[in-house]
Amino acid sequence: MADLTFKLYDLDDNEIKPKAVLSYELSRDADAACDGLRLNLLLDEAGAELYTVKAFYGKVCAFNGYVDTQRESINANGSTCFLYCRSSACLLVDSEAKPFTYNSPSVNALFEIGIGDGFRLCMDNVFSDIQYQVSKGTSKFGLINDFVFNVTGNRIRVNPKNEIVMLKSERVIKIDRDRILSVKREINRGNAVMGVDYKLNSSDDYLYHRVSRFMQKKRISATRMLNMSNVPDWQRETRLSSFVSNANAGYCCWELKLSGYADIDLADIIRTDLDGFDDYGDVVAVGIRHTCNASGEYTVIKAYSALDLEELSYVDE
């Protein structure tokens, strides 16, 4: 029996009870605004246009979203139905924010002006005393996410309670070794960056440098060049630090396959007694896939080691 249970609703918010759940795949990714759900099920009859889907792990809502695709095959035994759904963040991703330039904005003000009903902002107030420009084509999700990232270096996500929160966690998940079906580790040196050479004025040379002593110790020599002259002063430090950390984020990557449904969320810290598991620092979940099909039920976790890059800055004399 699957660990997740599902509730389906039509356009009139009437619950449609499936005859059976054949398979599901629930995916979360730190690089994606929306969680995704693929669901195959049997219905007594076809015809109802499904609108929303919720998934529960016990009494806890694990997914709250909207149907993007509904595909049915009808025969004498009823209807076989495939659903692809995105989490409620899709309402913000699919809607455009008003192009505007805000003076000394805060995330609270941007939320009140640009998001509207249906969501709650659940984070400490983030603010800046500089202008923030929202360009044409920016989504409502991007309105909040881009501002928070430029100020703090952190991204946001929308959880199943429709709460807008920071994509970070201090929760530690301990995984029993007996539950682990397989483990993979990758060291990705090809994309790693030792440092950045940058300039603050377009007429200057690349006199400023940010290097990672950690990557120097690993004998990584690759560097990148950035022109920071068009980057507002208040965004420069975040932009530099984020560039180096993002380039090296997947240096040590883990994939753990666990039996059953694992109650874990993005950015949770993973602990296990595998040899060498935390040699590069805390291991943080960046992707989660829960699957149930004819082969059984399992969870695959993609995780990165949170490196201490030991960053050092200097200027040419």
Task: Annotate each language-model stretch with its function.
Residues 70, 131-133, 216, 235:
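Residue-identity detector for glutamine
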Residues 79-188:
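Charged- and aromatic-enriched interaction segments used to assemble
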Residues 37, 65, 101, 125, ...:
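Broad hydrophobic/π-residue packing in well-ordered secondary structure
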Residues 4-8, 52-58, 97, 102, ...:
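Generic preference for hydrophobic/aromatic residues in regular secondary structure cores
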Residues 17-46, 183-317:
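An acidic/polar, Gly/Ser/Thr-rich interaction patch typically located in mid-to-C-terminal regions
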Residues 2-11, 40-72, 103-117, 259-282, ...:
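Short, acidic/charged, Gly/Pro-enriched secondary-structure junctions
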Residues 1-97, 149-152, 157, 179-181, ...:
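Assembly/oligomerization scaffold segments
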